[in-house]
Amino acid sequence: PSSLVGSEMCIRDRLNIKINIQKIDFLKAKFTQKYNSILLDAPCSALGTFRRNPDVTLKIDQSKIKKHQKIQIQMIEKSLKILNKNGFLVYIVCSFHPFETIEVIDKIMQKHKNIKLHKINSHKMIKRQSGYFINPLSFKELGGSDIFFVSVLEKI
């Protein structure tokens, strides 16, 4: 395969994608090939799900969010190692916290000069300096949406 999906198991069912998902410790796994595209749905605080899970806002713990950030950066770093030149890494979290979104991408961009941000052209997205937030009001006909942060990185 030329693509790798790192995600929760439910994404396959939710999106009806026919892919082989293996449950592995991504940071410990050994990869023998490189990929043209990687979708990384990283673990996060889930703050973007507050519309459906209001209690998530009561459980905000800055130290946990900082731990998530560390893991998110490690996962992106590993993804970049197994990403082909001219390949794309799509980083997604269901959070709007700057530590898990903009700050993560800013740290990666500062460290890796061979990475550039790729534009997403969609009226359903809200542009920020290091990525995009999905506009939950764009899906009113479906009852709304959670808030997601998406950043597309291209390895050059």
Residue ranges and their predicted role:
Residues V5, Q22, V90:
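Conserved Rossmann-like nucleotide-binding pocket used by diverse enzymes
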Residues R12, Y35, R52-D55, V104-D106:
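Short, glycine/charged-enriched secondary-structure capping and boundary segments
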Residues I73-K85:
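A short glycine-rich, Lys/Arg-flanked "PGG" loop and its adjoining helix->strand segment in the class I
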Residues F26, D41-M75, S95-E100:
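Mobile active-site "lid"/loop adjacent to the S-adenosyl-L-methionine
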Residues L27-K28, T32-L39, P43, K85-I156:
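C-terminal catalytic and target-recognition region of SAM-dependent MTase-like enzymes
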Residues R12-T32:
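S-adenosyl-L-methionine
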Residues P1-I11:
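Single conserved hydrophobic/aromatic residue that forms the stacking wall/gate
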